[in-house]
Amino acid sequence: MAECRPKNYPKLKDYKPSRFMLPSCHYDAAKADRAVTFIENLRHTKGKWAGKRFWLLPWQEQIIRDVFGIVDEKGNRQFRTAYVEIGKKNGKSELAAAVALYLLFADNEPSAEVYGAAADRQQASIVFDVAHQMVQMTPALLKRCKICLLYTSPSPRDRG
């Protein structure tokens, strides 16, 4: 049985495309819905939400719909880069990992490659570790990939 969004959990009610949408572009609801649905089928990996469905908050869904749903006449995304500034403890790593997994698994790009950048290896490993855990908790994704850890993770849970 499908897990339903909790009744008291906020949902984006009236999506309005970004004010930065070019006149030559349009909003493709199907493309945006695909990204939202993919992400909302992942699981949180940390804190009180660990193991629960990744129901997007309205501000998160607005970002996803803008980035993946605004396209040109050929269907290419208008936004190839997005700068998103989020305060501490507001799910940056979870959202970044979810977007990276969408780009890797569901964006219809053959041999897709997704890169993460950070000031150092420990910081870069945070999003990778979250994405790795999300894949481990999603049987459909786990069947489609093999994760090879080629470095010693500096994350605290791996220190024993």
Which residue stretches match the model-derived regions?
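Phosphate/NTP-binding elements of NTP-utilizing enzymes
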Residues: 1-153, 157-160
